[in-house]
């Protein structure tokens, strides 16, 4: 029997030897060399380990004529920044070559010294030994006591990343050129001042020498000059020559800025000096005039001194410091500019490139970037390029235009022009020219939602009201449609025709078919406004509550004119309006205290339900609605008192709208977080003008803090999604709490989810201690409200409960949230409590990225015209709405409440670009009668 070893003995070696496997060569682009500092324990993501400093910094050095190259100061001025980095050695490296080499002295053919104004030189140097690379900006300053009147300096941006220096060379060059021009302008100013002082000294010395020479002449009786007289004469001639030389130097240094008039690198303040100098005459040869003339600034009187004959340019003389060489104001500006440069280029190269690309894209996305982007970070130098004279930081922001300058939009558009799943009453408030205040009321279409859900959450107030002789009454029943009728007692009152189809379905049960919602106006020139307006305006809305035990009915809004007696309505209808009626026909014109509106045709009787009706109009768009303008100025005081019975005193006082809310006391803290509005006490609606302050003086620290607080809110509160949805959909969120610091912190965090109305306005109120009014919900979409435990705070809670169905309320003390239900998918991706993001700045960037995607969807929905316009004449509004909804759900992938978010952003885009002055559009006051749910932890 053959064993295994025998079998092995009979086999050939070739059978067991496998053919060698030759691996394919790795492509060159995938060949990554080993990290050079891997043996030192460094990670590949850290900066070059060969560097002896921890972060980038700026070094200012000088080539001193006494000690050679020496460092002067660093920015930031902290020894921990550059660590063990040898500043003296590196100063020797960057100042070893005179890049500013120029002849200063007596050029050929000239008897006087000439200043050669050389341009700055810019070089890039590297030191592999120190692991440092630098952008070096060489410049020359002038010193009267220095050799050749010049002092060479350089400013260097030192970094461990060579690619950062090379790729950011243009940006570094531009920023350092600004700092250099500012420093040199201050130096020329100081140098001219030194020349003027020197001329005064020389003039005083010449006077003394003249006096001494005359004394010696009188004392000399021999008729020939002594050696002392000859020495005095030579000294006097030297002084005369020095005066001429210094006058020529002063003329040169003063004429330099005129050559820079067409330049673009003038620092702030330099243009003012140029204009002052251009208006004055040139320096004359008279030393008295040149000494007394000060073209730069008013200085205190200078006492001249006698100049010795010996030269003062000795090595034992102490040279001026950099601060002494430059004017104090300009030196401070230069240091601020250098600090700005250090902060601007701080961070990795990838971060800088991403930020630059982001700013470039923001300039291109000027259509949607006003919603969520921070415009302070969009290159501020665009303003400087547009203005010939740079202004101070406080003057960079655009001035707030007055009411007279705010143009009135010609096209009126409603935020609720789309068909919503809830009934919505939208009220547009406009400020007309002059002192009169007009309001627009738009009653939009009604759609159905769950009847039982409506009974639980829809709160209708049952309050009586006394109607005046010229009141407007809106009645609605199950079968009524939107119409207007005219009563016999109001022959002098003309009513606009605004026929509109109001489609509604069953939303509640009623016991009587005549049950209706009444909108009663007690003033001659009023529009139809909700019940809550009685707090601030002499008008009222009374909504009768739906009875649960009755026949199935519908809430309908119908416009009509009622006689003085309540409940008496004239039966009739109005004929169709011609299609030529313009939208301006709906705007009332007031004359002699009456509302003058277009005339109405004859009435037609409707026997069916006792109400007037009107067929739909094809030319009317559903977003135009029913509009009536009224004036608060002409309100009847007596009817005002009648309509305000039963309300708190703080709501009855019209001045409370101005005095009780911190209108003129907007704190500066709001501007450091997110800016809101600057209110005015001129009128009740004059405080709707957006603030002139930029929308959030956001810094990296502010973004980090806001992102971190937003992360804490998302992880701490399980109902964060409905709260964020309220902000994104335009529903005002009120943050209620006792601790002001906690409320402000949360409001600042949630402000990153609030869409803006314009470039310079953020509708955020960080802290309010007085009761809220209906106007507050027009201005603010995020409000921090103080909870007061004392009886004085009862008014605040009463007003908040009064408007609770219009707002979302986040109670920080009780950890509750009352707001509508949210079932979408957008907010969970935006604010996921299970996110692995730890840093606030990272989460802030994540939010900005998600909101940018959201804005792109809103842009597509807004400017796809085929979605909003009928394709043919016979296409109904239902088909247009169906096409819009199909685009939102199928094309954009939106579900449930996410549709409302995109629709709201789209309406903001429309409002923003329908205005003649974008950014100054008045926000829309929007009411959504949707059921609210109470969330608890």
Swiss-Prot record:
Required for the homodimerization of the C9orf72-SMCR8 complex: annotated span: 1-349
Residue ranges annotated for the uDENN FLCN/SMCR8-type domain, each copy included: 48-220
Chain ranges of the cDENN FLCN/SMCR8-type domain: 318-835
Disulfide bonds: none
Modified residues (Phosphoserine): 402, 417, 468, 471, 489, 492, 498, 790
CC terms in the record's Gene Ontology section: Atg1/ULK1 kinase complex; cell projection; chromatin; cytoplasm; guanyl-nucleotide exchange factor complex; nucleoplasm; postsynapse; presynapse
Keywords: Autophagy, Cell projection, Cytoplasm, Guanine-nucleotide releasing factor, Nucleus, Phosphoprotein, Synapse, Transcription, Transcription regulation
Main localization category: cytoplasm
Keyword Phosphoprotein (UniProt): yes
Region (Interacts with WDR41 within the C9orf72-SMCR8 complex): 862-914
Protein localization: Cytoplasm; Nucleus; Presynapse; Postsynapse
Domain of life: Eukaryota
Domain dDENN FLCN/SMCR8-type: residue ranges: 844-910
Tissues where the protein occurs: Expressed in all tissues tested.
InterPro entries per the UniProt record, alphabetical: FLCN/SMCR8_DENN (IPR037521), Folliculin/SMCR8_longin (IPR037520)
Region annotation Disordered: where it falls in the sequence: 274-293, 384-405, 564-645
GO molecular function: GTPase activator activity; guanyl-nucleotide exchange factor activity; protein kinase binding; protein kinase inhibitor activity
Subunit architecture: Component of the C9orf72-SMCR8 complex, at least composed of C9orf72, SMCR8 and WDR41. The complex is formed of two protomers, each individually consisting of one molecule each of C9orf72, SMCR8 and WDR41. The protomers homodimerize via an interaction between C9orf72 (via C-terminus) and SMCR8 (via N-terminus). Within each protomer SMCR8 (via DENN domain) acts as a bridging protein between WDR41 (via C-terminus and N-terminus) and C9orf72 (via C-terminus). The C9orf72-SMCR8 complex associates with the ULK1/ATG1 kinase complex. Interacts with C9orf72; the interaction is direct.
Family: Belongs to the SMCR8 family.
PANTHER family membership: GUANINE NUCLEOTIDE EXCHANGE PROTEIN SMCR8, SMITH-MAGENIS SYNDROME REGION GENE 8 PROTEIN
Name assigned to this protein: Guanine nucleotide exchange protein SMCR8
Taxonomic lineage of the native organism: Eukaryota, Metazoa, Chordata, Craniata, Vertebrata
Gene: SMCR8
């Amino acid at each position: 029997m053959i064993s295994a070893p025998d079998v092995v003995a009979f086999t050939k070696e070739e059978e067991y030897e496998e053919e060698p496997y030759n691996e394919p060569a790795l492509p060159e682009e995938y060949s990554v060399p080993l990290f050079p500092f891997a043996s030192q324990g460094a990670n590949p993501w850290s900066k070059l380990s060969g560097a002896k400093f921890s972060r980038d910094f700026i070094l200012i050095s000088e080539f001193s004529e006494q000690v050679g190259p020496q460092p002067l100061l660093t920015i930031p001025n902290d020894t921990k920044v550059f660590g063990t980095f040898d500043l003296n050695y590196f100063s020797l490296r960057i100042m070893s070559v005179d890049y500013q080499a120029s002849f200063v002295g007596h050029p050929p053919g000239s008897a006087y010294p000439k200043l050669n104004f050389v341009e700055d030189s810019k070089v890039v140097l590297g030191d592999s030994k120190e692991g440092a690379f630098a952008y070096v900006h060489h410049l020359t300053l002038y010193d009267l006591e220095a050799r050749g009147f010049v002092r060479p300096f350089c400013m260097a941006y030192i970094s461990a990343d060579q690619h950062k220096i090379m790729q950011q060379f243009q940006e570094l060059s531009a920023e350092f050129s600004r700092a250099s021009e500012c420093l040199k302008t201050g130096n020329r100013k100081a140098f001219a001042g030194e020349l003027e002082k020197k001329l005064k000294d020389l003039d005083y010395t010449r006077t003394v020498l003249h006096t001494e020479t005359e004394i010696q002449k009188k004392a000399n009786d021999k008729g020939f000059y002594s050696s002392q007289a000859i020495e005095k004469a030579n000294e006097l001639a030297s002084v005369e020559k020095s005066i001429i030389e210094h006058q020529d130097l002063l003329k040169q240094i003063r004429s330099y800025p005129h050559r820079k008039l067409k330049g673009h690198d003038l620092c702030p303040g330099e243009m003012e000096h140029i204009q002052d100098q251009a208006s004055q005459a040139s320096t004359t040869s008279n030393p008295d005039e040149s000494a007394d003339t000060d073209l730069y600034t008013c200085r205190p009187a200078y006492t001249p001194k006698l100049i010795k004959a010996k030269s003062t340019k000795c090595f034992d003389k102490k040279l001026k410091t950099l601060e002494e060489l430059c004017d104090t104001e300009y030196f401070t500006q230069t240091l601020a500019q250098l600090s700005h440069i250090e902060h601007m280029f701080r961070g990795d190269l990838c971060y800088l490139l991403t930020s630059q690309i982001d700013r470039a894209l923001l300039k291109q996305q000027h259509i949607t970037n006003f919603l969520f982007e921070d415009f302070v970070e969009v290159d501020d130098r665009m303003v400087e390029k547009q203005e010939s004279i740079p202004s101070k930081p406080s003057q960079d922001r655009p001035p707030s235009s007055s009411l007279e300058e705010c143009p009135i939009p010609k096209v009126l558009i409603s935020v609720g022009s789309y068909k919503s799943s809830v009934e919505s009453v939208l009220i547009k408030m406009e400020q007309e020219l002059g002192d009169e205040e007009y309001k627009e009321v738009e009653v939009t279409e009604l759609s159905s939602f769950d009847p039982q859900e409506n009974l639980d959450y829809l709160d209708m107030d049952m309050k009586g009201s006394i109607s005046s002789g010229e009141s407007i009454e809106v009645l609605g029943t199950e079968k009524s449609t939107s119409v207007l009728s005219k009563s016999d007692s109001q022959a002098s009152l003309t009513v606009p025709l605004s026929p509109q189809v109001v489609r509604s379905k069953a939303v509640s049960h009623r016991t009587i078919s005549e049950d209706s919602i009444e909108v009663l106006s007690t003033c001659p020139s009023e529009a139809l406004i909700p019940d809550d307006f009685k707090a601030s305006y002499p008008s009222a809305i009374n909504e009768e509550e739906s009875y649960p035990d009755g026949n199935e009915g519908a809430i309908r809004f119908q416009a009509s004119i009622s006689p003085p007696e309540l409940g008496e309505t004239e039966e009739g209808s109005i004929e169709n309006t011609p299609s030529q009626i313009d939208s301006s026909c709906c705007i009332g014109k007031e004359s002699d205290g009456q509302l003058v509106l277009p005339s109405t045709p004859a009435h037609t009787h409707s026997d069916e339900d006792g109400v007037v009706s009107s067929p739909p109009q094809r030319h009317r768009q559903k977003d135009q609605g029913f509009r009536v303008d009224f004036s608060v100025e002409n309100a009847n005081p007596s009817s005002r008192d009648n309509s305000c019975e039963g309300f708190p005193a703080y709501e009855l006082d019209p001045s409370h709208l101005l005095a009780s809310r911190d209108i003129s006391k907007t704190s500066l803290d709001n501007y450091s977080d997110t800016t809101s509005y600057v209110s005015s006490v001129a009128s009740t609606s004059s405080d709707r003008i957006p603030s002139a302050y930029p929308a959030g003086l956001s810094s990296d620290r502010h973004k980090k803090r806001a992102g971190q607080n937003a992360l804490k809110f998302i992880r701490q509160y399980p109902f964060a999604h409905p709260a964020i949805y309220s902000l994104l959909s335009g529903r005002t969120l009120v943050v209620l709490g006792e601790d002001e610091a906690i409320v402000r912190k949360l409001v600042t965090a949630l402000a990153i989810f609030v869409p803006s109305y314009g470039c310079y306005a953020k509708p955020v109120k960080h802290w309010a201690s007085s009761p809220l009014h209906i106007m507050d919900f027009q201005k603010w979409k995020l409000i921090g409200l103080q909870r007061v435990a004392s009886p004085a705070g009862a008014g605040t809670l009463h007003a908040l409960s009064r408007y609770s169905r219009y707002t979302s309320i986040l109670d920080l003390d009780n950890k509750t949230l009352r707001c509508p239900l949210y079932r979408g998918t957008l907010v969970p991706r935006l604010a996921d409590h299970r996110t692995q993001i730890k840093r606030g700045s990272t989460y802030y960037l994540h939010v900005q990225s998600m909101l940018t995607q959201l804005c792109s969807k809103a842009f597509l929905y807004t400017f796809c015209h085929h979605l909003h316009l009928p394709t043919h004449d016979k296409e109904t509004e239902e088909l247009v709405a169906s096409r819009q909804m199909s685009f939102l759900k199928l094309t954009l992938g939106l579900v449930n409440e996410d549709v409302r978010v995109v629709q709201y952003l789209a309406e903001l885009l429309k409002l923003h670009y329908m205005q003649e002055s974008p950014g100054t559009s008045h926000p829309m006051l929007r009411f959504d009668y949707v059921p609210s749910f109470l969330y608890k932890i």
